[in-house]
Every structure is written in C-alpha cells, then in structure tokens.
Amino acid sequence: MFDHRILEILVCPLTKDKLQYNKDTNELISEKAKLAFPIRDGIPIMLIDEARKLEE
C-alpha cells in the first residue's frame, strides 16, 4: 500500500518538480521529465535508470 503523504516531500530527481501517483500502474509520474518511477513493496524507486519513459 502506498502512503500518499510521501508526495508532499518527494520530487522528481531530474526536474525537482512534484510527482503524481498513478494507481493503475503503481508508479510516481513526473509529467515534466516524462518519467514513471516504480513503487516496489510500497517503496518508491527514485532512480532515473529505473524509471520508465512515458510516451509522448
């Protein structure tokens, strides 16, 4: 289970912008960087190399 309060402190490591939680994919989305960071076992993986690139 993902704790939404974490969105108040986490930012995109690339752009430093706020993130959005996608419930369907269980990812944190950076709209500006067009990256989706996975959440594994309730832990956001905020490594750029682990992020999935979003389609244009």
Swiss-Prot record:
It comes from the Bacteria. Disulfide bonds: none annotated. Signal peptide: none annotated. InterPro entries: Trm112-like. One of its GO terms (cellular component) is cytosol. Gene3D superfamilies: 2.20.25.10. HAMAP family: UPF0434. Belongs to the UPF0434 family. This is UPF0434 protein ECH_0194.
